[in-house]
């Protein structure tokens, strides 16, 4: 494989091309991209954990340093002002020398408010992208050039198409996350609490809680019915029934987002349902290809859910087609089949149909689907179907004409297991689909 430095060089060529195009379209001279600033907790003197501007880390793998600035015009070498204060209170990152620094002009910025003296005098035609518009106004950036929607829409749209460098980083993030999942399963099998399982995961991936791309979902038993469960009980339950882990990792600013579900026992209905969801997820991925709308795959999985509900006699005396048509599958899989993945976990532009930002909303029947784009080569997405037993979603079905089709006794028996989710990260190619997760032998 090409070195990361060679891949990065081509990555910058691609970003420069996109920059030239967007500057010409919106008649701008350059973009000033801000890494971000630290924000203190209200009435306190310590800051929230720093989260870098995604548009900044698209250019440089600098994810932990606030008060950095990047000036790009699509022609000249991108220029990075790297915040390098004299500070004995806090650690200071050294001026970077890495695989990527040959392609970027790196200049030390000793004072956070010192960027004004470094920029071109004429700034009326520079666009600012960042989280501190008041800072841009202080730098005499025109108000209408602060986070201009058209520019951001354009950049977001093309972020769906990953460069080879980005794909290489995402494969590395997968490796880290997979090692974490193995460690977490081992911790679960040994009877640990959610809190301790999370520590095992973080240790294996080399992350802190603030480093992971999203809060880890470490859910034992009925907690697996809470889609974004992040509480982390310190005490292990008296009986281990099930474990749902939705946890990722980050490499050079790019995310992995994986989910696995395990049954404590292998000889019950729940264990068989986990196996069947896994099999159907793999079967769906095998059908994926460029040129098909992501919405179609979401709808197809509801048909697969119907098949499983019927097989396991959770819904009875109703055809699979009627189940989907009347949305009896809805309470069992209330979220979308997945989402775009990249610099952000829920990566941008999932609904954009073109580089002008034309929006196509999710179908009204499936409002929580996060992507309506037609799949194209170089797109990276998650495929994460699930079946859950969530009382608040099932309750409305306990009355009315369809209630008789629900096997309430079976549902009550499965509720203590919470639910099931299986999530892989896939790359669309010209000639098929790459499953980055399964390629690393994560069962």
From Swiss-Prot:
The family this protein is said to belong to: Belongs to the peptidase M24B family. Bacterial-type prolidase subfamily.
Positions of Mn(2+) 1 binding: 257, 339, 384, 423
Gene Ontology molecular-function annotations: aminopeptidase activity; metal ion binding; metalloexopeptidase activity; phosphoric triester hydrolase activity; proline dipeptidase activity
Protein name as catalogued: Xaa-Pro dipeptidase
Top EC group: hydrolase
Pfam families reported in the protein's UniProt record: PepQ_N, Peptidase_M24
Classification lineage: Bacteria, Pseudomonadati, Pseudomonadota, Gammaproteobacteria, Enterobacterales
Cofactor(s) listed: Mn(2+)
GO-annotated cellular components: cytosol
Species whose genome carries this gene: Salmonella arizonae (strain ATCC BAA-731 / CDC346-86 / RSK2980)
């Amino acid at each position: 494989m090409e070195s990361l430095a060679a891949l990065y060089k081509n990555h910058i060529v691609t970003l420069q091309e996109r920059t030239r195009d967007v500057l010409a379209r919106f008649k701008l001279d350059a973009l000033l991209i801000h890494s971000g600033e630290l924000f203190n907790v209200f009435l306190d003197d310590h800051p929230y954990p720093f989260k870098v501007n995604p548009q900044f880390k698209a250019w440089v793998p600098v994810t932990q340093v606030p008060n950095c600035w990047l000036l790009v015009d699509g022609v000249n070498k991108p220029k990075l002002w790297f915040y390098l204060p004299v500070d004995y209170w806090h650690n200071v990152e050294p001026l970077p020398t890495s695989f990527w620094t040959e392609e970027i002009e790196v200049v030390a910025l000793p004072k956070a408010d010192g960027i004004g003296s470094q920029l071109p005098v004429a700034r009326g035609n520079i666009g600012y992208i960042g989280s501190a518009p008041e800072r841009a106004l202080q730098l005499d950036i025109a108000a209408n050039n602060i986070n201009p929607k058209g520019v951001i829409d354009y950049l977001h749209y093309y972020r769906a198409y990953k460069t080879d460098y980005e794909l290489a980083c995402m494969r590395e993030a997968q490796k880290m996350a997979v090692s974490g999942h193995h460690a977490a399963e081992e911790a679960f099998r040994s009877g640990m609490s959610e809190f301790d399982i999370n520590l095992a995961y973080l240790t294996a991936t080399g992350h802190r809680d603030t480093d992971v791309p999203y809060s880890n979902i470490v859910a034992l038993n009925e907690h697996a019915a809470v889609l974004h469960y992040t509480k982390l009980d310190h005490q292990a339950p008296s009986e281990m029934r099930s474990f749902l882990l939705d946890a990722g990792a980050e490499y050079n600013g790019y995310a992995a987002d994986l989910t696995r579900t395990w049954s404590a026992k292998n000889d019950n209905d729940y264990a068989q349902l986990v196996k069947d969801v896994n099999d159907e997820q793999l079967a769906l991925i095998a059908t994926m290809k460029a040129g098909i709308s992501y919405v179609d795959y979401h709808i197809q999985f509801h048909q697969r859910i119907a098949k499983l509900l019927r097989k396991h006699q959770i819904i009875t005396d109703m055809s699979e087609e009627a189940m989907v048509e009347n949305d009896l599958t809805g309470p069992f899989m209330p979220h979308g089949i997945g989402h775009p993945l990249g610099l952000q976990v829920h990566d941008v532009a999932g609904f954009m149909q073109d580089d002008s930002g034309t929006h196509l909303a999710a179908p009204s029947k499936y409002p929580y689907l996060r992507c309506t784009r037609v799949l194209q080569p170089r797109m990276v997405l998650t495929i994460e179907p699930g079946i859950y037993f969530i009382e608040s979603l099932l309750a409305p079905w306990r009355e009315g004409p369809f209630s008789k089709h629900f096997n309430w006794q079976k549902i009550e028996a499965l509720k203590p297991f919470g639910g099931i989710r299986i999530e892989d990260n896939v790359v669309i190619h010209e000639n098929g689909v790459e499953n980055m997760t399964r390629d690393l032998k994560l069962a």
